[in-house]
Curated annotation (Swiss-Prot):
Disordered: annotated span: 1-28, 298-352
Descriptive protein name: Lipid storage droplets surface-binding protein 2
Polar residues bias (residue ranges): 298-309
Organism this protein belongs to: Drosophila melanogaster (Fruit fly)
Top-level taxon of the source organism: Eukaryota
């Protein structure tokens, strides 16, 4: 009996010990070890805080799963925090009353904040929409005022333009205005004739003009007949403007095409000939300048020795002086003989 009772007691003890061990070995979450904080729960339930919390968790999960090194480091940090909470839980439970008092105080503060600032209950999108509507309500009146001023200015400008256009048509409708319009037409026709003479149109110009007309029809929906100006009887001002503009465009296109065509036709040989002739002209100019400078130097030197008499036979100053002295002493006329070199003496002539 004793053994049976001992076995039964041992079995009961084992069962009790096993139950106690199971209670100790059951892992508890770190959240369950800490006291419940109503203030923290209400703060997390706020839309703005909740959105920020979800976003931070999303970023944390992406960073943690991006690399094994990050995953290992963050997992180790989580384990350290869990162990710290588990270690500090027995000490925190002893401070339940102060923590509860602080929690209730924070809850009351949150209630007052929700009453004074109800915007904290709204979602971020609702806050954005409200802020946008406030800004629009403030700015919209000023924008409407600016738009009104702009519309009034455009209307005044249009009315002034129409009035000026009408007055110009009235002036051109008179006799002198008609003469001026006819003069513009005559001058335009003469300019077109001169343009055709000096800058004739080639086949490429015709093709480009046709392409331009087709592009204008595609873009503006206008036919090629609208290329001609309106009659002067309908609108003299518009007729004059279109005539002058058409002539200006025609001259610019024709001159540009002819000049570009001439540039394309210039060959490398022509360029070489032009450069060689230019170099020869420069050399000739330098040679002429050199001759002129040399002649100027000779003239200056001859001007410095102008006291000596010159003759085709050489200088005769000393000979003349000697002859004059001898003739004075002998009282006989003596003729000055030219100086002759010894190697070129004249042969003696007999007196017979």
């Amino acid at each position: 009996m004793a053994s049976a009772e001992q076995k039964h007691a041992t079995g009961n003890g084992t069962t009790g010990n096993g139950t106690a061990m199971n209670d100790v070995d059951q892992p508890k979450d770190a959240k369950d070890l800490l006291p419940h904080l109503e203030s923290l729960e209400r703060i997390i339930k706020l839309p703005v805080v909740n959105a920020a919390w979800d976003k931070s968790q999303d970023v944390y999960g992406k960073v943690k799963g991006k690399n094994r090194v990050f995953e290992w480091a963050l997992t180790a940090a989580e384990d350290c925090v869990t162990r710290a909470v588990t270690t500090a839980a027995p000490f925190v439970t002893k401070l339940d009353r102060p923590i509860a008092y602080v929690d209730q105080t924070l809850v009351k503060g949150i209630d007052k904040l929700e009453v004074k600032a109800p915007i904290i209950k709204d979602t971020p999108q609702e806050i954005y929409n409200q802020a946008k509507s406030k800004v629009i309500d403030v700015v919209q009146p000023h924008l409407e005022r600016v738009v009104k001023f702009k519309a009034a200015g455009q209307q005044k400008a249009a009315s002034l333009k129409d009035l000026a256009w009408q007055k110009a048509n009235e002036v051109l409708a008179t006799q002198y205005g008609s003469l001026a319009v006819n003069g513009v037409d005559t001058t335009t026709a003469l300019a077109e004739r001169l343009l055709e003479y000096y800058f004739p149109k080639c086949e490429s110009d015709v093709e480009e003009d046709n392409d331009d007309k087709q592009n204008a029809v595609v873009q503006n929906g206008k036919s090629s007949e609208n290329d001609m100006p309106v009659p002067a009887s309908e609108d003299p001002v518009l007729h004059t403007v279109q005539t002058v503009g058409r002539l200006s465009n025609k001259i610019s296109r024709r001159v540009y095409r002819n000049v570009s065509r001439q540039i394309k036709q210039v060959q490398k040989g022509n360029i070489n000939d032009y450069l060689s002739s230019l170099i020869a002209a420069l050399k000739l100019h330098q040679y002429i300048n050199f001759i002129n400078s040399s002649m100027g130097t000779n003239v200056e030197q001859s001007g410095g020795s102008s006291s000596d008499a010159c003759s085709p036979f050489g200088t005769t100053t000393s000979t003349t002086t000697t002859t004059t002295t001898s003739s004075t002493s002998n009282n006989k006329p003596v003729v000055a003989l030219p100086h002759v070199a010894k190697s070129k003496r004249a042969p003696a002539v007999s007196s017979q």
